[in-house]
């Protein structure tokens, strides 16, 4: 049975530096390479197929423990200042719960027997760029995408400064969206939600104006 260890929202640090948006997943499979403890990080907003594949690939690299950091606090503030629709990012509690539920379902499924049933899973918020990735001596690898590879390199530089062993960096390929050829993106989902809300408001506006006119008459 998977052991899920949850840190309280806004009460922990994080794992994945530089870029916290793991918006797409990858070609699943560790190629037989495994590490006692691995770390991954991301926003994990509106958990989608890309996230699923990325988490599965990361879990396959883990022999005993996987730490999953989810962006919150100052990390989200940076995203909201630089990206459209970032204000629609789900609350940290919702994103943490979605990740936990997916991990539990994944390990319980017979399709995912390559993942150890007793894998220890830590789910915690990220409130700074590095968090436990530069203090946890037991970590052996960090799982990244091509986009977040610079973050993995930054972690190793910080670990070197602190006299800690370097982490192996495993890069998971991104999965393109079939319809567009682009990567699967949480930002795209937020954009669609914003457009639906705008369309709804535009449809309701004439009705509200008519009601106001009737009241005046």
From Swiss-Prot:
Inhibited by CoA. One of its GO terms (biological process) is coenzyme A biosynthetic process. The keyword ATP-binding applies. GO terms for molecular function: ATP binding; dephospho-CoA kinase activity; pantetheine-phosphate adenylyltransferase activity. It catalyses: (R)-4'-phosphopantetheine + ATP + H(+) = 3'-dephospho-CoA + diphosphate. It is an enzyme of class 2 (transferase). Keywords: ATP-binding, Coenzyme A biosynthesis, Nucleotide-binding, Nucleotidyltransferase, Transferase. Pathway: Cofactor biosynthesis; coenzyme A biosynthesis; CoA from (R)-pantothenate: step 4/5. Its EC number is 2.7.7.3. Pfam families: CTP_transf_like. Belongs to the eukaryotic CoaD family. Reversibly transfers an adenylyl group from ATP to 4'-phosphopantetheine, yielding dephospho-CoA (dPCoA) and pyrophosphate. Does not accept 4'-phosphopantothenoylcysteine as a substrate. This is Phosphopantetheine adenylyltransferase 2. It comes from Oryza sativa subsp. japonica (Rice).
